[in-house]
Amino acid sequence: IEIAHSLCLTERQIKIWFQNRRMKWKKESKLLNSSVQSAGEDEEKPTE
């Protein structure tokens, strides 16, 4: 509520902003985890 007042926004706008940030963070962390795992799998394959 205090954040909303200080930024001259509604509580709803603040809630949506935080929700969007959480979704973006989840998406980015999922992409990072999948890229790290695929890189790790490449390293584990034996080379001839």
From Swiss-Prot:
The keyword Transport does not apply. It comes from the Eukaryota. Gene3D superfamilies: Homeodomain-like. One of its GO terms (cellular component) is nucleus. Residues 29-48 are annotated as: Disordered. It holds the Pfam family Homeodomain. CDD domains: homeodomain. One of its GO terms (biological process) is anterior/posterior pattern specification. Sequence-specific transcription factor which is part of a developmental regulatory system that provides cells with specific positional identities on the anterior-posterior axis. This is Homeobox protein Hox-B6. It comes from Xenopus laevis (African clawed frog).
